[in-house]
Amino acid sequence: MTSIVSEEAYEDLVNIQNYTYSKYGENQWQEYGIDLDKGIAHILEHPFSGHTRKDVPNGYQASTVREHVMIYRVEDKTIYLVRILHGKMNFTFQFSGY
């Protein structure tokens, strides 16, 4: 499978990195980053293992990594990672343009 990371998901990742690094330090960020990488690898290996959410548009799947939820969709042989959001965020608001 091919994967494409949206600009929004990339920005989410940068924001997670900045927040975690500033609040908890480099070691915690490195641990969290490893877990996020493992989460992405799991999606690539098992693209239909995610779950649906009522607050995310139809056709999208969610996969939880610690406090964050990776939102993605699968089309043909491509996985589109569209957002990486904190589990306490308002997902409906984040997807109002989709």
Walk through the language-model features, giving the residues of each.
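Basic/aromatic recognition patch in beta-strand/loop cores that engages polyanionic ligands
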Residues: F48-T78
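Conserved N-terminal glycine/acidic-rich loop preference
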Residues: E8-D12, G59, H68, F91-F93
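Basic, Lys/Arg-enriched alpha-helical interface segments
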Residues: T2-K54
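Aromatic side chains
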Residues: Y19-Y24, Y32, Y60, H68, ...
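Enriched for short, Lys/Arg-rich terminal
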Residues: H68, R73-Y98
